[in-house]
Amino acid sequence: MTRVLATGTFDLLHPGHVFFLRQARSFGDELYVLVARDSMIKHKAQPIVPEGQRLKMISAFGVVDKALLGSESDIFEPLKEINPDIIVLGHDQFFDTGELEKNLGERGFKAKVVRIDDAMKCELCSSGRIIKRVLERYGQNEE
């Protein structure tokens, strides 16, 4: 049984997220998903949707066997419970695959790291594009 782990913020769910999770699932038999904690997101703007709500939405996907919130202190902590065989990164995730595999090995994990370079091509397959569209349509100062 091959256990796959996918991670992400999953803010403003869109078809690109669905594509990523389906691709991740194709690497194994079980798909676990770590949803980033609001407090750990430092490389981009804070999510619009709170972490608990994002977790519930990801948990509802049929391709996902189990979704969990990430750790608020150590990104490797949840891996002790999950013990993945493969960690799948999306095309836009900032981790370096080689560096991540090295860090995993130093912590006793044997997971292989793969990146899905394909991205679904559609007009609103990006949380950033969705936000831009909302701002264009409704203006920045309106509620």
Swiss-Prot record:
Reactions catalysed, as given in the entry:
FMN + ATP + H(+) = FAD + diphosphate
EC numbers listed for it are 2.7.7.2
Indicate whether Metal-binding appears among the record's keywords.
no
Q: What class of enzyme is it?
A: transferase
SUPFAM superfamilies reported in the protein's UniProt record: Nucleotidylyl transferase (SSF52374)
Q: Which Gene3D superfamilies match?
A: HUPs
Q: Name one GO molecular function term.
A: ATP binding
Which residues participate in ATP binding? 9-10, 14-17, 92
Q: Does the keyword Transferase apply?
A: yes
Can you supply a Gene Ontology BP term from the record? FAD biosynthetic process
Q: In which pathway does it act?
A: Cofactor biosynthesis; FAD biosynthesis; FAD from FMN: step 1/1
Instruction: Name the UniProt key words of this record, in alphabetical order.
Output: ATP-binding, FAD, Flavoprotein, FMN, Nucleotide-binding, Nucleotidyltransferase, Transferase
Required co-factors: a divalent metal cation
Mind telling me which NCBIfam families this protein's record contains?
cyt_tran_rel
Q: Tell me the protein family, please.
A: Belongs to the archaeal FAD synthase family.
Function, in words: Catalyzes the transfer of the AMP portion of ATP to flavin mononucleotide (FMN) to produce flavin adenine dinucleotide (FAD) coenzyme.
Oligomeric state and interaction partners are given as:
Homodimer.
Q: What is this protein called?
A: FAD synthase
Q: Recite the lineage of the species.
A: Archaea, Methanobacteriati, Methanobacteriota, Stenosarchaea group, Methanomicrobia
The gene name reads ribL
